[in-house]
Swiss-Prot record:
Annotated gene: rplP
Region span, Disordered: 1-21
GO process annotations (BP): translation
Organism: Blochmanniella pennsylvanica (strain BPEN)
Task performed by this protein: Binds 23S rRNA and is also seen to make contacts with the A and possibly P site tRNAs.
Subunit structure: Part of the 50S ribosomal subunit.
InterPro entries: Ribosomal_uL16 (IPR047873), Ribosomal_uL16_bact-type (IPR000114), Ribosomal_uL16_CS (IPR020798), Ribosomal_uL16_dom (IPR016180), Ribosomal_uL16_sf (IPR036920)
Designated name of the protein: Large ribosomal subunit protein uL16
Keyword Ribonucleoprotein on entry: yes
Length: 134
């Protein structure tokens, strides 16, 4: 179940810059959360891999919320194609992550189990993270 938008106004986007920080991004749904402390881009497959690792670690008890959604298309030109001739095709989708962004939330599990689950999930992600609680 790779995440991507159902439909967008435009197929391709400018690269843009990933600056700024998320100020006061609090826990909304769960009791414990995985919070990013560095910036980066999360692919939809990385978001799914971390979700699977977390749900397996908590043995499907409790509830998980995914607080990020990959809404930015990343394009790539085919191998051995000369420069020019337009922008490449959409290869995958990413979510831009700033420091302070809440990535996942969990409810209904003990603190130790949540910590271990988030540790397994964080190992699948390319950004540095920390565990926070209410």
């Amino acid at each position: 179940m790779l995440l991507q938008p159902k439909r967008t106004k435009f197929r391709k986007m400018h690269k843009g810059r990933n600056r700024g920080t998320k100020v006061n991004d609090n826990i909304s749904f769960g009791q414990f959360a995985l919070k990013a402390i560095s910036r980066g881009r999360l692919k939809s497959c990385q978001i799914e891999a971390a979700r699977r690792a977390i749900s397996r670690a908590i043995k499907r008890q409790g509830k998980i919320w995914i607080r990020v959604f990959p809404d930015k298309p990343i394009t790539k030109k085919p191998l051995e194609v000369r420069m020019g001739k337009g922008k490449g095709n959409v290869e995958y989708w990413v979510a831009l992550i700033q420091p302070g962004k809440i990535l996942y939330e969990i409810n209904g599990v003990p603190k130790e189990l949540a910590y271990n689950a988030f540790k397994l999930g964080a190992s699948k992600l390319p950004v540095k993270t920390t565990l926070i609680g209410r």
